[in-house]
Swiss-Prot record:
<comment type="similarity">
    <text>Belongs to the universal ribosomal protein uL29 family.</text>
</comment>
<dbReference type="GO" id="GO:0006412">
    <property type="term" value="P:translation"/>
</dbReference>
<dbReference type="Pfam" id="PF00831">
    <property type="entry name" value="Ribosomal_L29"/>
</dbReference>
<protein>
    <recommendedName>
        <fullName>Large ribosomal subunit protein uL29</fullName>
    </recommendedName>
</protein>
<dbReference type="GO" id="GO:0022625">
    <property type="term" value="C:cytosolic large ribosomal subunit"/>
</dbReference>
<dbReference type="InterPro" id="IPR036049">
    <property type="entry name" value="Ribosomal_uL29_sf"/>
</dbReference>
<dbReference type="GO" id="GO:0003735">
    <property type="term" value="F:structural constituent of ribosome"/>
</dbReference>
<keyword id="KW-0689">Ribosomal protein</keyword>
<dbReference type="InterPro" id="IPR001854">
    <property type="entry name" value="Ribosomal_uL29"/>
</dbReference>
<dbReference type="InterPro" id="IPR050063">
    <property type="entry name" value="Ribosomal_protein_uL29"/>
</dbReference>
<keyword id="KW-0687">Ribonucleoprotein</keyword>
Length: 69
């Protein structure tokens, strides 16, 4: 999965964001195991997945804050 763009994330519904976070967490889990066993070739993917999760969580929080105002 390539790095997610902010515009794509903003277009997602809350349920889609939750699903994306869950998928990225699973991917990170698998990537960590691959790194530990020496099978991981693209080590930058770990960083991208971590940042994608943070990006989605940030936009979700902004959406929630906008709805409550």
């Amino acid at each position: 999965m390539a790095e997610m763009k902010t515009g794509d994330i903003r277009a997602m519904s809350d349920d889609q964001m939750d699903d994306a976070i869950l998928n990225l967490k699973k991917e990170r889990f698998n990537l960590r195991f691959q790194r530990a066993t020496g099978q991981l070739e693209d080590t930058s993917r770990l960083r991208e997945a971590r940042r994608d999760i943070a990006r989605i969580k940030t936009i979700a929080a902004q959406k929630r804050a906008g709805k409550t105002k």
